[in-house]
Amino acid sequence: MAQGAMRFCSEGDCAISPPRCPRRWLPEGPVPQSPPASMYGSTGSLIRRVVGPGPRGRDLGRVTAPCTPLRAPPSPHIAPSPWGPSSPTGQPPPGAQSSVVIFRFVEKASVRPLNGLPASGGLSRSWDLGGISAPRPTPALGPGCNRKLRLEASTSDPLPAGGGSVLPGSRDPSRGPLVPPQIGADGLYSSLPNGLGGTPEHLAMHFRGPADTGFLNQGDTWSSPREVSSHAQRIARAKWEFFYGSLDAPSSGAKPPEQVLPSRGVGSKQGSGVAVGRAAKYSETDLDKVPLRCYRETDIDEVLAEREEADSAIESQPSSEGPHGTAQPPASRPSPCPGPSSSLGSGNEDDEAGGEEDVDDEVFEASEGARPGDHMPHSGLLKSPVPFLLGTSPSADGPDSFSCVFEAILESHRAKGTSYSSLASLEALASPGPTQSPFFTFEMPPQPPAPRPDPPAPAPLAPLEPDSGTSSAADGPWTQRREVEESDAGATLAPRKELPSPSHSEDSFGLGAAPLGSEPPLSQLVSDSDSELDSTERLALGSTDTLSNGQKADLEAAQRLAKRLYRLDGFRKADVARHLGKNNDFSKLVAGEYLKFFVFTGMTLDQALRVFLKELALMGETQERERVLAHFSQRYFQCNPEALSSEDGAHTLTCALMLLNTDLHGHNIGKRMTCGDFIGNLEGLNDGGDFPRELLKALYSSIKNEKLQWAIDEEELRRSLSELADPNPKVIKRVSGGSGSSSSPFLDLTPEPGAAVYKHGALVRKVHADPDCRKTPRGKRGWKSFHGILKGMILYLQKEEYQPGKALSEAELKNAISIHHALATRASDYSKRPHVFYLRTADWRVFLFQAPSLEQMQSWITRINVVAAMFSAPPFPAAVSSQKKFSRPLLPSAATRLSQEEQVRTHEAKLKAMASELREHRAAHLGKKARGKEADEQRQKEAYLEFEKSRYGTYAALLRVKMKAASEELDTIEAALAQAGSTEDGCPPPHSSPSLRPKPTSQPRAQRPGSETRAGAGSTRPKP
């Protein structure tokens, strides 16, 4: 809602609307022009002169001034009249917007013009219409009429009240003849573009210098005596020439007019003691930047009486032809300011010359004795770029005559793209009392803009600077705010600099000056709902990676997201822990809502932890996993408040179980944590006390007997299974696996869907030792029948018989064994079952396999060793450490990139290195008796070196046989190996191939379970 303010002198009365004017009294003129899209703001002022009633019984003196539009070229299109059938009264014009209207009540005073021009009549209609009239008598003012008027500063009005009272002439209402002004050396001006005639050009720069700023320092109030002093005339002349240029053209050769000192009346006041009616601040650099403005006055009563002449004035605007009987001024007179046209008849020169400044203000003055015989001269016509279309809001009884006339004047004499409300509300306005405020505030509803074609932009002569000369002290806060707004919107309005707005009436009220046709910034086009939908809402709608720290918590969104995470609706198990482990309020809410789906009532801590870990894959960094466990501990304590003393105690015990699980079932070779160690580590951590020993013993036994299993991502598992069945996959995934293993992350299986199948057949498996040769629990040592498939470097164990192309199940995939750097040997020391062979993997797990026959056993041993020798990549160098503790190096599971010959040479080099290191190790400890942990480490290293020597010897011998056979068929290699045992040269088969010729030992010796003796000497293993 735009707002307007009305200010008037507390000593004078305000304008009361006259009797209502019938609609038929309004002038019926031609169809006005349509306002351009960029003209929308204006300021209207009302001026009242204390005079008697008019000849028609109407109260005179209700006038309007000034009205300032935005500068824009006239629209070439014609729009229907607002009173026509196409635009009913009360409807806003297309593209119109609400603006601020300032109604100013100023008691007019007669100001004598310069050079003896008649001024007793004040501002006359002859000046308004471009003609000159004779002076007329003015009734004497009463004692209360000679008042000081306090004017409201408006940036749209460059001259204060009375500033435009330097007049060329006046007209007596009782006489018709017009008295022309004195033109030449004694004339103040001849023809101004707004009906005032042009100004001589030799005074155009008279008051442009910095030295003339003294005229600008004026007071806030001024008196209006009957006889104007010379000081007042000089001030008026200075203001006029400052805003509109000098009044004499240098080409005319005339001298500047001399001021006529009027005789002072008895009641006149000294001019030196009079303050001028508005405070204006100028700087020396702003004098040349003040845009020129022209005034125009029209009497409301005369417009009512002479509506035909007013209509003819509008008709003459686009055609540059005035009505018959109008006075034509000299055509050679130049215009002091870039007005609508230098000839005052055409509206196109403004566009052609690129003048950015339109006629900003008009002053409409009431005069007595209006006669219909007076005509508006061609030179005095106001060039209105576009007509003003009214969007009135009539009262219940309809608009009164004053409102109608005011609207008619604004429509017919000014070009506005602004919609005004009806002035019928002024009827209730009365003279302010001593205690009443001199301001009246009202609101006008904004009018919705309609799409309009953009008018052609004029070519500006120079960039228009803000009118600093028209800013008063009262406008300071508004002007400062406007400057801030313009600085913020500078980037947006930069492309439309061809349509600058010199109107400051909107600026003083903080209204934007953006053209109607301009598009809003891109930031305003973004929907607020999109900006309010933060990342948490978008995550709840399906996104999985939009959470970040500091997001605002939303309980409803957290509940929706937790429900979807629990049901895995659009999420995977691997995504759950990531969303629960974030360190922000929203993730905490999500975790709390997610844990509400779990009911741990009556469960022990380890049981609840197993149930919880089956639903999500606990992944991420340590702090993220710790946050997830904290949410679990909180929920467990809520369900079992009697089981533990506090929530912190539950969290401490949960983390202790996770560490115990890693220590007992991890890949470390050191000493395992005992039950006593576990209890001792938790002393004093239960809120300063100890946990019950029975509880800790039960938890230790549970974790030791059955490790905590993390959930496996089903999506990744299904993708891996499909890749095993797909012969031509595009993506190869790594799947943790290993029968009876701990799903070590260091020993991932790399399925090779395109790998060849080297052998398949029935096998019976038994897990003999877990990684690092740890003894397998008795409950997991049983024999199980499978159908083995050697595909690539992976031995798959299926429940059913092998069918090419059939996908493996989850359990079958978990039973898969990687054979990289593995060695298969005949189990000659195992006598419980026939045709049994050992398979030791890279992580030192030991399996026993029983084949249906001896031939099948030898075939499985040969093919497993050949495939391992062909594709096992060279190992990385051993780790360097300052400790004497032995640690086996990790062996790569990827396939080698070496050629067959390079692979053979690598195996032979490693064989020599292992043999040399084994001799050094035995020599170093010869004759020394080690005890305890040191003796165990010596035995572990010696067993490792013996196994590696045997493995690399077997690999090198098998690859030599394969290269000699010059065939990729394993059947051919098996036949060649069988012949190598009875060759003519007497060369025995490789001693490192126990599957071909195992050699029994003569003296067995007790060994640690899972260890081996020296290569080639046989071994004695404890029977499981």
Curated annotation (Swiss-Prot):
Question: Where is there biased composition of kind Pro residues?
Answer: 71-95, 445-463
Positions of modified residues (Phosphoserine): 126, 156, 720
Q: Name the segments for region: Disordered.
A: 67-96, 154-195, 250-277, 307-401, 434-536, 976-1024
Q: Where is the composition biased (Basic and acidic residues)?
A: 495-507
Domain (PH) ranges: 756-869
Arranged from A to Z, the UniProt key words for this protein are: Cell membrane, Cell projection, Coiled coil, Guanine-nucleotide releasing factor, Membrane, Phosphoprotein
**Lineage of the native species?**
Eukaryota, Metazoa, Chordata, Craniata, Vertebrata
A Pfam family name for this chain?
Answer: Sec7
Which InterPro entries has this protein been placed in? PH-like_dom_sf, PH_9, PH_dom-spectrin-type, PH_domain, Sec7_C_sf, Sec7_dom, Sec7_dom_sf
Positions with biased composition (Acidic residues): 348-365
Q: How does it assemble?
A: Interacts with ACTN1. Interacts (ARF6-bound form) with KCNK1; does not interact with KCNK1 in the absence of ARF6.
Protein name (Swiss-Prot/TrEMBL) = PH and SEC7 domain-containing protein 1
- Listed as disulfide-bonded, the cysteine pairs are none
* Annotated gene: Psd
Family per UniProt? Belongs to the PSD family.
Give a brief account of the tissues where this protein occurs.
Highest expression detected in brain and some expression detected also in uterus, stomach, ovary and intestine, with isoform 2 being expressed at the highest levels. In the brain, isoform 1 is highly expressed in the strata oriens, radiatum, lacunosum-moleculare of the hippocampal CA1-3 regions and the dentate molecular layer of the hippocampal formation, with lower levels detected in the neuronal cell layers and the stratum lucidum (at protein level). Not detected in tongue, thymus, spleen, lung, heart, liver and kidney.
Coiled coil ranges (UniProt) are: 898-924, 956-983
Biological processes, Gene Ontology terms: neuron projection development; regulation of ARF protein signal transduction
**Listed GO CC annotations:** cleavage furrow; dendritic spine; postsynaptic density; postsynaptic density, intracellular component; ruffle membrane
